[in-house]
């Protein structure tokens, strides 16, 4: 009986530990299911957020492209610059001419002061059809100003007497002139001129191909002895 009791105790212990392990496994399974369910629930809004972000980025890109296309057709608007520090004013172009009149005091012949109104815009660049100047204005005296003399430059006596002569105006070149445009055929149709005659006095003009040298004329031909001078020696 003593041996049987410990065996029953061991079985009861094994059953106890087996039940405890089953409980632990069940608790672990429930915990995993809860974790997976929570993870899935957390993942759903993340996916929705990603989709919403993608949609928003696409819409922003489309809006940016539309704005760029609109900017190409926008008219240029000049920005107003503050010139107060530089003491300058912005120029404003207007179609109508704004002429401001001012009064000018002039002294007449009798010493009376005359007020003359004139336009600021008038001048040599903007002539307006106004009245001619009044005759009451005093005549302006012309003062002769002596012309300044050029500084003295030394010139040699020969250069002082020489005067610059204008060369005669040359006309167009004569194309058919042999003197200006000589050719090979000019000797065949050569016409004697006064200049050629003067040249003949100092130079000999060759006009023929065959030229007789000096000392080779017909009068200077030597008489040659053509007979045999040694014939006398043969008779002996």
Swiss-Prot record:
GO terms for cellular component: cytoplasm. Residues 96-111 have a biased composition (Acidic residues). It is found in: Cytoplasm. Pfam families: CDV3. Residues 1-75, 92-111, 120-181, 209-236 are annotated as: Disordered. Residues 20-29 have a biased composition (Basic residues). Residues 34-46, 127-140 have a biased composition (Low complexity). Disulfide bonds: none annotated. Residues 51-67 have a biased composition (Basic and acidic residues). InterPro entries: CDV3. Keywords: Acetylation, Cytoplasm. The modification N-acetylalanine is found at residue 2. The keyword Protease does not apply. Belongs to the CDV3 family. This is Protein CDV3 homolog. It comes from Danio rerio (Zebrafish).
